[in-house]
């Protein structure tokens, strides 16, 4: 359960013997740190009793969690974990100012990012997003401030700073507005990182982004894709409404495809997928085999859901490596006033249709990214 400063201090202690009492629990846990209370829950069923132990200090609760989980009390191995707060009691941070923090090292914790951003003002919430199955960090998180100016300063001064061996990326995280009913019904398909990263060669670092009929610029693409990794090259074709973005790593490109596909940029729902690259990257534009779309539609045809930032109906953008079940409204990264990060998914080519062909101009010979052919 969360206190006013956001630090949990209450532990759940389960799988208890029916002979265990509140007094005994307090005696044992007080050896680690001063306890405020203990509440024993004994249900009139076959289930074992459990209790909640509240400490005065978060550090004592954390120490007790590490020390007591798996220990035997009166012959039974107890289970200790952080007590969860019912969603109805969660702090409402919907009107606070949320900062997206990307490119986090795997070892970075919620406490680490909270400490790093604390100098900029009072923080209402902070979270490193984790894979719900493995417990590993997905490489990004969020920090919420009470004050907008504090959040702005944090974005400006923390972007590019080193944290745990990596330069982090910061930007606004904005709440995704409800989609129209028709959009919700027709565009529910979501991409998973595990599927996308394996759809192309590990040497392929190029993303195709299409569907931007107006306002397409190099700067817009850089703002849109920079949170996902180092960009090596950008080629835009404004008259065609699409662009190619080449990253330094295959994984960064996969993150970008998963996160940007189906989002709204300059008022247009965009489509992102791999640009096909040949083993010899010095050759001219290579053609993308659009028969892959049949495979993609099968792979991505089942609705997927993602691990969420569990605070008042907010959700993280699927920026991380592992997608996990959840089903709420979405966080997105606001890239610019005119290109809001919408975090949505689902735009797919109509059946039997291929995206428009890319015809490289003569002065672009040797450009080793990707082009597309019709079937």
Curated annotation (Swiss-Prot):
Residues 9-85, 97-175, 205-277 form the RRM domain. The modification N6-acetyllysine is found at residue 122. Pfam families: RRM_1 (PF00076). Expressed in brain, heart, kidney, lung and skeletal muscle. CDD domains: RRM1_TIAR, RRM2_TIAR, RRM3_TIAR. One of its GO terms (cellular component) is cytoplasm. GO terms for biological process: apoptotic process; defense response; negative regulation of cell population proliferation; positive regulation of hippo signaling; positive regulation of miRNA-mediated gene silencing; regulation of transcription by RNA polymerase II. GO terms for molecular function: DNA binding; mRNA 3'-UTR binding; protein-RNA adaptor activity; RNA binding. Residues 345-375 are annotated as: Disordered. It comes from the Eukaryota. Residues 352-363 have a biased composition (Pro residues). InterPro entries: Nucleotide-bd_a/b_plait_sf (IPR012677), RBD_domain_sf (IPR035979), RRM_dom (IPR000504), RRM_dom_euk (IPR003954), TIAR_RRM1 (IPR034492), TIAR_RRM2 (IPR034494), TIAR_RRM3 (IPR034496). Phosphorylated by MAPK14 following DNA damage, releasing TIAR from GADD45A mRNA. Its main location: nucleus. Keywords: Acetylation, Apoptosis, Cytoplasm, Lysosome, Nucleus, Phosphoprotein, Repeat, RNA-binding. RNA-binding protein involved in alternative pre-RNA splicing and in cytoplasmic stress granules formation. Shows a preference for uridine-rich RNAs. Activates splicing of alternative exons with weak 5' splice sites followed by a U-rich stretch on its own pre-mRNA and on TIA1 mRNA. Promotes the inclusion of TIA1 exon 5 to give rise to the long isoform (isoform a) of TIA1. Acts downstream of the stress-induced phosphorylation of EIF2S1/EIF2A to promote the recruitment of untranslated mRNAs to cytoplasmic stress granules (SG). Interacts with FASTK. This is Nucleolysin TIAR.
């Amino acid at each position: 359960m969360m206190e006013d400063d956001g630090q949990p201090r209450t532990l759940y202690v389960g799988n208890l013997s029916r002979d265990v009492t509140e007094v005994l629990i307090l005696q044992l846990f007080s050896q680690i740190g001063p306890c405020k209370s203990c509440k024993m829950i004994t249900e009139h069923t076959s289930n074992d009793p459990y209790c909640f132990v509240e400490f005065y200090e978060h550090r004592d609760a954390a120490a007790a969690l590490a020390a007591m989980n798996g220990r035997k009390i009166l012959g039974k191995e107890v289970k200790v974990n952080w007590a969860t707060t019912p969603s109805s009691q969660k702090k409402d941070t919907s009107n606070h100012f949320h900062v997206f923090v990307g490119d986090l090292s795997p070892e970075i914790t919620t406490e680490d990012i909270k400490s790093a951003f604390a100098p900029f003002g009072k923080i209402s919430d902070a979270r490193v997003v984790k894979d719900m199955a493995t417990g590993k960090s997905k490489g990004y998180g969020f920090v919420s401030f009470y004050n907008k100016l504090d959040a702005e300063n944090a974005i400006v001064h923390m972007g590019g700073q080193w944290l745990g061996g990596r330069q982090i990326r910061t930007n606004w995280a904005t709440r995704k507005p409800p989609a129209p009913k028709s959009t919700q019904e027709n565009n529910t398909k979501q991409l998973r990182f595990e599927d996308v990263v394996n759809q192309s060669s590990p040497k392929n670092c190029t993303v195709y982004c299409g569907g931007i009929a107006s306002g397409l610029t190099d700067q817009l693409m850089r703002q849109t894709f920079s949170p996902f990794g180092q960009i090596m090259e950008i080629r835009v074709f404004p008259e065609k409404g699409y662009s190619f973005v080449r990253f330094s790593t295959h994984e960064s490109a996969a993150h970008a495809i998963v996160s940007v596909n189906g989002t709204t940029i300059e008022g247009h729902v965009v489509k992102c997928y791999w640009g096909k690259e040949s083993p010899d990257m010095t050759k001219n534009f290579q053609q993308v085999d659009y028969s892959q779309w049949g495979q993609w539609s099968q792979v991505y045809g089942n609705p997927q859901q993602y691990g969420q930032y569990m605070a008042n109906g907010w959700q993280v953008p699927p920026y991380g490596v592992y997608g996990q079940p959840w089903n709420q409204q979405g966080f997105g990264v606001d890239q610019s006033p005119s290109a809001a990060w919408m975090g949505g998914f689902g735009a797919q080519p109509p059946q039997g249709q291929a995206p428009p062909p890319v015809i490289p101009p003569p002065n672009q010979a040797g450009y080793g990214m990707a082009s597309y052919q019709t079937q």
